[in-house]
Structures are given as C-alpha cells and as structure tokens.
Amino acid sequence: MSDIDPTVRADPLPEDHDRALRPQMLSEFVGQAEARANLKVFIASARQRGEAMDHTLFHGPPGLGKTTLAQIMARELGVGFRMTSGPVLAKAGDLAAILTNLEKRDVLFIDEIHRLNPAVEEVLYPALEDFELDLVIGEGPAARTVRIELQPFTLVGATTRMGLLTTPLRDRFGIPTRLQFYTEDELFIIVDRNARKLGAPADEGGAREIARRARGTPRIAGRLLRRVVDFAVVEGDGRVTRALADMALNRLGVDHLGLDGADRRYLRLIAENYGGGPVGIETMSAALSESRDALEEVIEPFLLQQGLIQRTPRGRMLAQKGWTHLGLDAPRAQTDLFEG
C-alpha cells in the first residue's frame, strides 16, 4: 500500500529507474542483516499492538537502501506511504499540509532530513512527541497559536550526514539505524537476481565481476548491471559473462576496485599536484570543480573505507595503498611515515 503524492515529492531520485528491481518485502532484501533483524521485530511489535511504529532514522552513505527500507516498512505495516525531502519543506505550512493529511499509523519518509529549515524543524518536534501541531496564525499583537491534533504516524528520516542533524531532532528518533556498505557476496546475489529480472541472465563470473566493482553499493551495482546488459545485447549474445562484463566496465572507466574517472582524478590531484598531501578539502573542491559536499558524501567514503586516502587535521593525504593503485611511488618522506 503506497501512496506517493507527486506534490510532496522531491526531484526524481536516481534509483527511480530501478524501481522494478527493488525488493518489495524484508524477506527479499539482501544485506544489512542486523538492521533487517531489528526492523522485523519492531514492525511485528507495532502490528500486534495496533500502534504506529516508533520514529526511525536511517543514516549512512548514499545508495544503500534507505528509501527502499522505508517503503518496505510501510508495506509490511500495511499502511500508507508518503515521501518528501528536507529541501522541499521550505515553510512550516508545507509540513503542516502533509502531516494533516496523514492517515492513522501512516509512514512519512523525509529524505535529506539534515537539510530541514530550522523553522520547519521546530514545528516538527511536538508532532513527533505528542502528535500535535502548533501553528501561529497572524502577526504581531493579533497573532495566536492554533493547536491541531494529528493522527499517530511514523516518521522515517534518511540522511547521509548524521553529524549535521541537530541533537534535539536526532534524539526524537527511537530507532536510529546505520546502514553499512555491502559485501561482494551480498552484491553478487543482488546482481544475479536483477540480471534475471532484466532478461539477461549472468553467469557467476559476470555477476561477480559487476559486484566486485560496485563500491559496496546496490544502487551502483544496478546502474553498472544495466550498462553491461546494454553491451551484452548489442555486442554479445544477450548473456552477461565475465569477459563481457570486464570489457564493458573497462570501457565505462570503472577499474577493478570500482573507482571511476572522478575517483582517479581525486587521487591523482593529491599525488601529482600536492606530493601526496596533506591538502585541504576546500582546495580539493576548487581544483576539481566539485562541491565540498560531493567530495565528502560521494567520493571520499569509499576511498577511506578502502584505505586509499587518510583524513588528517591538516587535510587529505594519499595512503600507501593509494600510491600503489595509481602505480606511483610514494615520496621518500611519506614512505618513512608509512613504515614508521
């Protein structure tokens, strides 16, 4: 049961094209074993008690399934699902319009919740705690507060920047859940299943090659799979083999670690222009013509997880593994540092 109102939707999400590939129930969801096990308990408890499930916060890098899990929660709870995002809720009235239209126990999903307007956030507090909305009508001496009773609902927030959430908002989520990068085996299962759904079955080598280069992220795995299927249809026999996947991914500029051109430009900038670092994030942003947020949210998490770069108080540095991946020798001073 899913009611996505286009008037409260953000711009189309990158994964909207992969809707047919998304799992519909928790039992179909691969990965995030700890989060799934806990959510299963919380959903069952809410259903048995006939109450709205506690407010839930999903946080972690983009593309790990935050939106999908929120939709699954609503489906398994048997309630309606409404979706919006932090930047869209510019005024308190925008939030009030959504909250007053929620049915009993509905799930409201707010993506990028760390980007909520502070004025909107203040209105959200009593709604989360007491299911009441306090709105100020009028201005100056004639202003008065109107209290609106709301139906009990579940707010599901999603953020890639947990540290940017204010403490009062963060503390109002009873179920904070961190999503982790996926293992290669988990991504292999996802790729294998989705290849069949796309009508282009993959052999084990082909599916594993895509999984290996997907940066631990299902969204990226889905995107790479679609492109490899294009090559399989046009330049192959319709099947995704290891040789075809390797050829297609190399032509797409995705190397054996899953790094693309943007990642390699980032690493080469530190190596070739700044002697391996340290170099400040603002300098990196200007040199690469990328926003600081794009570097910190999209590029750096996987490079850090793979041990290719280091974050230091003085800036970013290339780790020994980063030099090795680029096929370059670290400067002598850095070599001594790594060995020491």
Swiss-Prot record:
The entry's family comment says: Belongs to the RuvB family.
Q: Where is this region: Head domain (RuvB-H)?
A: 256-340
Region annotated Small ATPAse domain (RuvB-S) sits at 183-253
Which residues does the annotated region (Large ATPase domain (RuvB-L)) include?
Answer: 1-182
Write out the residues that bind DNA: 292, 311, 316
Q: Which GO terms describe its biological process?
A: DNA recombination; DNA repair
> Which keywords belong to this entry?
ATP-binding, Cytoplasm, DNA damage, DNA recombination, DNA repair, DNA-binding, Hydrolase, Nucleotide-binding
Residues that coordinate or bind Mg(2+): 67
The cellular component terms of Gene Ontology attached to this UniProt record, alphabetical and capped at eight, are: cytoplasm; Holliday junction resolvase complex
CDD domains xref list: AAA
- Name the major location: cytoplasm
Subunit organization: Homohexamer. Forms an RuvA(8)-RuvB(12)-Holliday junction (HJ) complex. HJ DNA is sandwiched between 2 RuvA tetramers; dsDNA enters through RuvA and exits via RuvB. An RuvB hexamer assembles on each DNA strand where it exits the tetramer. Each RuvB hexamer is contacted by two RuvA subunits (via domain III) on 2 adjacent RuvB subunits; this complex drives branch migration. In the full resolvosome a probable DNA-RuvA(4)-RuvB(12)-RuvC(2) complex forms which resolves the HJ.
- Residues involved in ATP binding: 21-22, 63, 66-68, 129-131, 172, 182, 219
Question: What is its subcellular localisation?
Answer: Cytoplasm
Domain of life, per lineage:
Bacteria
**Mind telling me what this protein is named?**
Holliday junction branch migration complex subunit RuvB
